[in-house]
A protein has these predicted regions:
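Rossmann-fold NAD(P) dinucleotide-binding segment
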Residues: 56-65, 73-92
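Hydrophobic/small residue at the entry helix of a nucleotide-binding pocket
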Residues: 13
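Peri-transmembrane interface segments
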Residues: 247, 253-272
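Extreme N-terminal starter segment of soluble prokaryotic enzymes
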Residues: 1-5
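Rossmann-fold NAD(P)-binding glycine/threonine-rich loop
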Residues: 93-117
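Active-site-lining helix/loop region of Rossmann-like oxidoreductase modules
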Residues: 8, 16, 134-256
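NAD(P)-binding Rossmann-fold cofactor-contacting core
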Residues: 23-44
Length: 272
């Protein structure tokens, strides 16, 4: 018997979930829910029902798990606790500083409804979290380092696009080479958030938007840009489509530690 899956939100993440379902014989895509006109959504799977997001509760007894593919900035903090009242839910909430708060909200809703809520199971937090866990088990005396990029952060790009005056935008997370090399060399440096990464934004403005105001909102945004050296470029919509239409990304989880009676052996575990 297959597990019946619903997908809430059909962007890049939603399509990725659809591809993953195809590779698992015990999963079945039952329905896709969207805030767009359902008739405008073309799924990769044939004969899958596409519904308005507002109709999702009508599927309460037809879906076993609802996977939420919205953004962490404004969608998931509202959606995950709300839909946990009706479904078992999974999300990839990735605003690290707000995970305890998000956990409490989802936990309360799921316990009250008798459902299961699984949060923050994306890339990081998610896969990278698992790699940190096993590396810590192997090298208990050591330090963790995580570097993201160079690549597009969909969460940060989504946060940019929600600013008034922004028509579209992409954000690249870029590791600081000197910091990365110091870690790989086993130097165990003490690094601030700002010393590990820079952020580069390519933004298309709405007509009449205040460029300086938008730039300030980006650079001072808590949990996203305020702790980083951030560069904002204003470009045309055509430039964005031509040069920044992809969503490549990468990253490195590194555990540097020592073993031996006198801690005489140095080791580095790296996952990318």
């Amino acid at each position: 018997m297959s597990i019946r899956i619903g997908i809430m939100g059909y962007g890049n993440l939603g399509r990725g979930i659809e591809c993953a379902i195809k590779q698992n014989e015990d999963l079945e895509l039952t329905a896709v829910f969207t805030r767009r006109n359902p008739e405008s959504v073309q799924t990769l799977s044939k004969d899958v029902t596409v519904c308005k997001a507002s109709e999702v509760t009508d599927w309460k007894d037809k879906i076993d798990v609802l996977i939420l593919c919205g953004g962490s900035a404004t969608d998931l903090p509202e959606q995950t606790p709300e839909y946990a009242k009706y479904f078992n839910v999974v999300d990839s909430f990735d605003t690290h500083a707000r995970i305890p708060e998000h956990f409490d909200n989802v936990d309360a809703a799921a316990k009250n409804a008798g459902t299961v809520g699984i949060i923050s199971v994306g890339w990081d937090p998610g896969m990278f979290s698992l790699n940190r866990m096993y590396a810590n088990a192997i090298l208990p005396n050591g330090k963790d380092y995580t570097f993201w990029g160079k690549g597009v952060s969909q969460g940060h790009s989504d946060a940019i696009r929600r600013i008034d005056g922004v028509k579209d935008g992409k954000q690249y997370t870029i590791p600081v080479d000197a910091a990365l090399e110091a870690v790989r060399n086993g130097e165990n440096p003490e690094l601030t958030t700002r010393q590990k990464h820079t952020r580069e934004c390519f933004v298309v403005l709405e007509d009449g938007a205040d460029a300086k105001k938008v730039e300030n909102e980006i650079k001072t945004m808590p949990n996203y840009f305020a702790d980083y050296d951030t560069t904002v470029h204003y470009i045309s919509e055509e430039e964005l489509k031509e040069n920044h239409s992809g969503i490549p990304h990468g990253g490195f989880v590194i555990r540097s530690g020592k073993t031996g009676w006198e801690e005489e052996n140095s080791h580095v575990i790296e996952y990318s």
